[in-house]
Amino acid sequence: MDYQDYHEPVLARESVSLLVTLPGIYIDGTLGGGGHSLQLLRHLQTLNGDSLLVGIDQDTHALEAAGKKLGEFGDRRRLVRGNFGMVKELVEPMMRGAGNGLPVMGFLLDLGVSSFQIDTPERGFSYLKDGPLDMRMDPDGPLTAADIVNGYEEAALAKLFFRYGEEPLGGRIARAIVSARSSAPLTTTGELAEVIRAACPRKDLAIKTLSRIYQALRIEVNDELGVLEQALEDGFELLSSGGRFAVISYHSLEDRIVKRFFAAKTSADWGPKGLALREPLKPAEAVLVVRKPLEATAEEISRNPRSRSARLRVIQKL
């Protein structure tokens, strides 16, 4: 396993330049191969004062690759296994230990699935390469895509595809899966892809349907949206005053969650209309660093196509 197997980090220059302001603890909650962390550490070297980079990933392969990539930085980085929804319990001990009382000044989340995971058939993330129906970001996780495809009832599958895939053919696909598995369990990504393609009334739309169904399964397997909501709450709580929170999202479901959370933190609560209060019931807790989400440039998209749908939002805690 080598860090070169991992994708070029998306919006790296923009996210790092907007995130890093003052020395302190910086958290890369989606370490992957260490691309963003490398840029963060290089930027932190230009600041006067002690800093510590904490990298979090639930994939042991990613931790191994990032460890090689960031080896030159020694004890200025700490890499820990876990998902970013556990950020509070993972980072708080470091604030008292290796962090030596440093404040948390930045938290970065890149919510995309790594190209290494997608391109590794054994991980079961892609319909383009046949492999076991797995999709676990944590290889030791309890739930696989095969468990869902072969175990959920038709109504539950349809609901899942509508909710997490926003797939209009969700009910039709669910029926096709239940029919197919009645003969034998679906165990590979290729078998599932064949069932989905056959169920699509228009073959020119099959790729979009495949993408949405696989997205829905991946989100369910890894509880991605629940983990994100937990990480937003706990990550913001960890930040010191002046600390910044940057999130790169790739699809509307996760971006809506981030947008709603950031809007709540940057808005004051003035209570019901008509109260005419002199001061808000609850003041804003943060300010927007960028008013509109940043997107990749045409140059970056041509160089790194997976950046096409990326959106970067950043707030600063008051």
From Swiss-Prot:
<dbReference type="Pfam" id="PF01795">
    <property type="entry name" value="Methyltransf_5"/>
</dbReference>
<dbReference type="GO" id="GO:0005737">
    <property type="term" value="C:cytoplasm"/>
</dbReference>
<comment type="function">
    <text>Specifically methylates the N4 position of cytidine in position 1402 (C1402) of 16S rRNA.</text>
</comment>
<keyword id="KW-0963">Cytoplasm</keyword>
<feature type="binding site">
    <location>
        <position position="57"/>
    </location>
    <ligand>
        <name>S-adenosyl-L-methionine</name>
    </ligand>
</feature>
<keyword id="KW-0808">Transferase</keyword>
<feature type="binding site">
    <location>
        <position position="84"/>
    </location>
    <ligand>
        <name>S-adenosyl-L-methionine</name>
    </ligand>
</feature>
<feature type="binding site">
    <location>
        <position position="117"/>
    </location>
    <ligand>
        <name>S-adenosyl-L-methionine</name>
    </ligand>
</feature>
<keyword id="KW-0949">S-adenosyl-L-methionine</keyword>
<dbReference type="InterPro" id="IPR002903">
    <property type="entry name" value="RsmH"/>
</dbReference>
<keyword id="KW-0489">Methyltransferase</keyword>
<feature type="binding site">
    <location>
        <begin position="34"/>
        <end position="36"/>
    </location>
    <ligand>
        <name>S-adenosyl-L-methionine</name>
    </ligand>
</feature>
<dbReference type="InterPro" id="IPR023397">
    <property type="entry name" value="SAM-dep_MeTrfase_MraW_recog"/>
</dbReference>
<dbReference type="InterPro" id="IPR029063">
    <property type="entry name" value="SAM-dependent_MTases_sf"/>
</dbReference>
<keyword id="KW-0698">rRNA processing</keyword>
<dbReference type="GO" id="GO:0070475">
    <property type="term" value="P:rRNA base methylation"/>
</dbReference>
<protein>
    <recommendedName>
        <fullName>Ribosomal RNA small subunit methyltransferase H</fullName>
        <ecNumber>2.1.1.199</ecNumber>
    </recommendedName>
</protein>
<feature type="binding site">
    <location>
        <position position="110"/>
    </location>
    <ligand>
        <name>S-adenosyl-L-methionine</name>
    </ligand>
</feature>
<comment type="similarity">
    <text>Belongs to the methyltransferase superfamily. RsmH family.</text>
</comment>
<dbReference type="GO" id="GO:0071424">
    <property type="term" value="F:rRNA (cytosine-N4-)-methyltransferase activity"/>
</dbReference>
